[in-house]
Every structure is written in C-alpha cells, then in structure tokens.
C-alpha cells in the first residue's frame, strides 16, 4: 500500500489500494477486526473531533468494534481513527471549538428557509451532513459533503457517496450508508443550497468588512454543483449585518437565558438581566 502527496492535501494517510476504496459500516467493522494490513493506517484518539479533513464517520455505539470502539472516522491526514467515544462526542467537539457561536446564525437562516436544522452543520463551504438527524441522542453516521463529487440512492435502502479525485491519479473513495431517509436527495439538495447562500453571505461580509477574499476548498465538490441544489424560499436577509439586526433580540435573550441557567440559585439574575436587556436595546436602537 502507498500514500500520495497532493498540493493542498499533504500526505493522504488512508490506504490507497483499490480494494480499500469502497467502505460501508459492515466492511469497516469486518476489516478493522480481521485485516492486519490496515493496522499501519489506524490511529486511536478518544479526543478526535470532526474537522475539514474528515471524509466520513460511522457510528458503532450499539455494536462496538473490538468490543470498545464506538466510532470510526476516515480522515485524510490522520488515517482511520478509532474512538471509544461516540460520534456525538466528535460532533460536540466541533461545535464547542469551531462553530458554537456561528451555529446560532446559521440555524436561524435555516429556519427562515424551512431547512431541518438538525441534519447538518454548515461552515464556509464546508458541510457536515448527518445521515440521521443529530437532535436527541446525536448518535448518527456523518458524511462530509465538501469532499463528495456525487451520490446516489440504491434501491431506497442504501446511499452511496463518491469522493472527488484526491490525487493526480484519480484516487476516489466510496462510502455507503444503509437505511437512508426516503427524502434524502431532497434534504441534501436543500442543505447544498443553504450552504451556497450562507457561504455567499460570509464571502460578501469578509470582503466588505475586512477586505478579505476567502477562497473555497474543493471547487469540484458537490457543494458547487447547482444541479443538486433544491431551491428554497428566498431568505429575508441579504447580509450578515441585516441578519444580526433581524435576530438581535432573539440572540441576546438566548445568551442571557444561558447565563441564567448556569446560575440557577441566583434568582435575582432574572430581574437584573431583564433590566440590562432593556438598557442594551435602548442604546442599540437609540430608543
């Protein structure tokens, strides 16, 4: 087996032999438990979190690999990462360290357009998609659409995602997921459109406010293929500033409620926050 070096990707640490190009949950478990050739590509990391180099993640909480590993991530730079933590923990790490504040805004945008807010995590031209909604118990498989070229649903019982070419020789991985949602194609199309709109807002904001031109990774991924988009109702805002103004009160209340929950015994905080909220709004809107 070998590893390839490609501009922008560095060393690809996943196995590249043809027999290791196709993956599913069943194949992943069987190979890790029985194929000694994979050992050199396996890493153990209970603190692993989703990142832009993650291709896909399979959840094994109900049937742990080797009796203890509850999640497996395919990472271009790290290789095949096994964790005793669930995919819930991997996703929570991303939420805490990368997109926690940003999630408030993008979820509000998603609600405006009628998108299921618990089906994916959108960053700037980076899209983590949950094969089953991650609300509730959070235990679900993930596919990272910014590395995906195309996908198809096979007989309504399996969805197969094909990656973009990852090196000059056309290295492609295929990830299969069982029991996809009946309307999976529509949901993904909505999220792709949502990502397109949100990323464009972000690009314009960075250009106008900071004079920065941010570039997208993987311009040949499905994120930039409008043929897959499912058009949503037009958003009611066309800039981050208008978005902030539109949702200011909601975000402020959410922030204050979070603080109050952290200090439950201090009931007087409810009164104090109510007072300061009114003052802040007066100052902001010159009331």
Segments predicted by a language model, with ranges:
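Eukaryotic intrinsically disordered, low-complexity regulatory linkers and tails enriched in Ser/Thr/Pro
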Residues: 1-142, 151-287
């Amino acid at each position: 087996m070998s590893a390839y070096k490609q501009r922008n990707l560095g060393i690809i640490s996943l196995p590249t032999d043809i027999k290791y190009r196709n993956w599913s949950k069943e194949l992943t478990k069987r190979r890790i438990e029985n194929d000694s050739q994979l050992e050199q590509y396996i890493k153990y990391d209970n603190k692993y979190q989703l990142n832009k180099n993650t291709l896909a993640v399979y959840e094994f909480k109900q049937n742990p690999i080797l009796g203890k590993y509850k999640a497996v991530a395919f990472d271009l730079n790290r290789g095949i990462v096994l964790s005793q933590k669930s995919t819930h923990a991997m996703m929570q790490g991303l939420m805490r360290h990368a997109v926690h504040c940003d999630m408030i805004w993008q979820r509000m945008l998603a609600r405006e357009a009628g998108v299921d807010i618990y089906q994916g995590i959108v960053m700037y031209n980076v899209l983590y998609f949950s094969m089953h909604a991650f609300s509730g118990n959070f235990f679900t498989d993930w596919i990272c659409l910014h590395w995906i070229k195309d996908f198809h649903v096979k007989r309504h019982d399996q969805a197969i995602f094909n990656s973009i070419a990852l090196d000059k020789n056309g290295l492609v991985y295929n990830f299969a997921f069982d029991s996809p949602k009946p309307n999976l194609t529509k949901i993904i199309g909505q999220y792709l459109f949502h990502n397109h709109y949100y990323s464009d807002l972000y690009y314009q904001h960075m250009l106008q406010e900071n004079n920065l031109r941010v570039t997208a990774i993987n311009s040949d991924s499905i994120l930039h293929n409008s043929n897959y988009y499912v058009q949503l109702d037009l958003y009611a805002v066309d800039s981050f500033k208008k978005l902030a103004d539109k949702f200011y009160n909601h975000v402020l209340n959410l922030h204050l409620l979070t603080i109050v929950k952290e200090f439950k015994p201090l009931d007087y905080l409810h009164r104090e926050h109510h007072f300061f909220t009114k003052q802040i709004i007066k100052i902001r809107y010159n009331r």
